[in-house]
């Protein structure tokens, strides 16, 4: 659930570490994302009675460790999650259909078991049948809500357990918002229990240490500004509950070491992070990049986004080139596109030194509107006359690639309105910088 790969990415980035749960006995209160834990428990048991027993046992165990447990419970409909709900219903139906076929197969096979260890084999198959039957029952969301509400009645008179209903808001969102409020008065986050990876996005908003737990593991999370950036970038690229992500891109532990991380979640920094490969513009479609980035920022910062209209999915190419269009169009307004490249370069470069008369004559000799082929030596000569270098540049201003004049950002990549070339794959590019 939540943001794909975020937990593994934070583990890879060393801000999230796994601890021995047995070494930590006492917490300053415990906050639980109830539905995520309830579903996790339900997937491990065979019937409602067992689910009730196991869930209550978990809560009582948390009371012993935290003194007080707050169960955050989803309630009501969240309008901006309609698309997510529709997709989950579709996925749930496919899963239910698959499990029903599996149940039919097991029910048929158990009738034909005979011979050696017949009773043991039948007992094992019956356990599987019971579990499949229960999972099919829980594939109906109404059954989930009814069974959860029934279990929660066991805590109505328990002074050590508070039921906190989150009306038209995600429980994990409200939980982390309340945890921040508690921190402001006590100086310590409660233990957060959830299987939803959005929780780690919300917990990355400040650099204070946090303890986060799922059913089987305990984590210590000490996020830096870079981790907060990584969490937001992962929500943007891989998607979260309210934004489907950038189609055609994914952040994984395998490519994390190629991605530049920053402290500030700005458009320039985001595009730099995405520029781990070359991209070509495939369509003329543009998207409102600022709106997407603002939404991810506000969501991660626990601002109330539930009244927003969530951004639509776009491709990674549409995002990148829409993000770069403003810079390219600003440059293009003072750029002679229809003349040969040497002339384009002379017009685009701002002199960084005095140009003497002999150099002016040299530049004049390069003006040839009939010659559309570019000479590398001419390009280097023009750069030198204007006070620029082609090697060992601390700041790259332009790149020349196949008669294309490209802009550079953060010395990390080159681009125009139709292509982006990463600096790690720039053997065929002539740098112009200083």
Swiss-Prot record:
Top EC class, one word: hydrolase
GO BP: DNA repair
Chief site of localization: virion
Cofactor(s) the protein needs: Mg(2+)
Pfam families according to UniProt: Pox_G5
InterPro entries attached to this UniProt entry: Poxvirus_G5
Localization: Virion
An MF annotation (GO) of this entry: nuclease activity
Domain of life (superkingdom): Viruses
CC annotations in GO: virion component
Signal peptide range: none
Cofactor: binding details: Binds 2 magnesium ions per subunit. They probably participate in the reaction catalyzed by the enzyme.
EC number, UniProt record: 3.1.-.-
Keywords, comma-separated and alphabetical: DNA damage, DNA repair, Early protein, Hydrolase, Magnesium, Metal-binding, Nuclease, Virion
Primary role: Putative nuclease that seems to be required for double-strand break repair, homologous recombination, and production of full-length viral genomic DNA.
Family: Belongs to the XPG/RAD2 endonuclease family. FEN1 subfamily.
Listed name of the protein: Putative nuclease OPG089
Provenance organism: Monkeypox virus
């Amino acid at each position: 659930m939540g943001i794909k790969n975020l937990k593994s990415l934070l583990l890879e980035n060393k801000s999230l570490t796994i601890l021995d749960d047995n070494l930590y006995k006492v917490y300053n209160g415990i906050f639980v994302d109830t539905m995520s834990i309830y579903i996790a428990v339900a997937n491990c048991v065979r019937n409602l009675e067992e689910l009730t027993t196991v869930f209550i046992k978990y809560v009582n165990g948390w009371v012993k460790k935290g003194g007080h447990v707050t169960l955050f419970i989803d309630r009501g409909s969240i309008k901006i999650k309609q698309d997510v709900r529709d997709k989950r219903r579709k996925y749930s139906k496919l899963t239910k259909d698959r499990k029903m076929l599996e149940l039919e197969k097991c029910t048929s096979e158990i009738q034909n078991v005979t011979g050696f260890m017949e009773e043991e084999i039948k007992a094992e198959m019956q356990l599987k049948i019971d579990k499949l039957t229960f999972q099919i029952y829980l594939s109906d969301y109404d059954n989930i809500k009814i069974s959860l509400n029934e279990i929660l009645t066991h805590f109505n008179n328990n002074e050590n357990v508070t039921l906190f209903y989150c009306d038209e808001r995600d429980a994990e969102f409200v939980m982390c918002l309340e945890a921040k409020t508690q921190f402001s008065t006590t100086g310590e986050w409660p233990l957060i229990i959830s299987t939803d990876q959005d929780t780690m996005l919300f917990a990355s908003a400040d650099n204070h240490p946090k303890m986060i737990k799922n059913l089987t593991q305990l984590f210590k999370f000490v996020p830096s500004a870079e981790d907060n950036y990584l969490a937001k970038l992962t929500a943007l690229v891989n998607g979260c509950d309210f934004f489907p992500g950038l189609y055609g891109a994914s952040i994984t532990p395998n490519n994390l070491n190629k991605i530049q991380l920053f402290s500030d979640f700005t458009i320039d920094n985001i595009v730099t992070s995405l520029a781990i490969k070359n991209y070509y513009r495939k369509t003329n479609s543009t998207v409102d990049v600022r709106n997407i980035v603002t939404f991810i920022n506000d969501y991660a910062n626990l601002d109330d986004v539930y009244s927003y209209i969530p951004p639509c999915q776009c491709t990674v190419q549409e995002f990148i080139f829409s993000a770069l269009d403003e810079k390219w169009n600003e440059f293009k307004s003072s750029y002679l596109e229809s003349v040969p490249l040497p002339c384009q370069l002379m017009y685009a470069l701002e002199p960084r030194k005095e140009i003497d008369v002999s150099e002016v004559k040299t530049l004049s000799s390069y003006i040839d509107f009939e010659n559309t082929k570019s000479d590398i030596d001419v390009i280097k000569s023009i750069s030198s006359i204007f006070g620029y270098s082609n090697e060992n540049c601390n700041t790259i201003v332009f790149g020349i690639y196949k008669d294309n004049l490209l802009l550079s950002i953060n010395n990390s990549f080159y681009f125009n309105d139709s292509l982006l070339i990463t600096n790690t794959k720039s053997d065929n590019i002539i740098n112009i910088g200083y």
